[in-house]
């Protein structure tokens, strides 16, 4: 790799703002805030609004919209006579 071209990546903790779940991963993001992770080391902290630990799709809490009922209602309303 050429020096000075690629961004520096380092270990960062991402914290879910809604439930407090934390993930340690590599990122090019950096922060002035730090947090002591469960391994005892301090890492930059990035707080995010939603993660796979709180998003309804991943937690199984999602609700499906009854699209078939809406389509039938539309067809019934605008049916050609």
Curated annotation (Swiss-Prot):
InterPro entries cross-referenced by the UniProt entry: Ribosomal_bL28/bL31-like_sf (IPR034704), Ribosomal_bL31 (IPR002150), Ribosomal_bL31_B (IPR027493), Ribosomal_bL31_sf (IPR042105)
GO cellular component: ribonucleoprotein complex; ribosome
GO molecular function, one term: structural constituent of ribosome
Coiled-coil residues: none
Keywords: Ribonucleoprotein, Ribosomal protein
4Fe-4S listed as a keyword: no
GO biological process annotation, one example: translation
PROSITE patterns on file: RIBOSOMAL_L31
HAMAP family, alphabetized: Ribosomal_bL31_2
Family: Belongs to the bacterial ribosomal protein bL31 family. Type B subfamily.
Subunit structure: Part of the 50S ribosomal subunit.
Protein name as annotated: Large ribosomal subunit protein bL31B
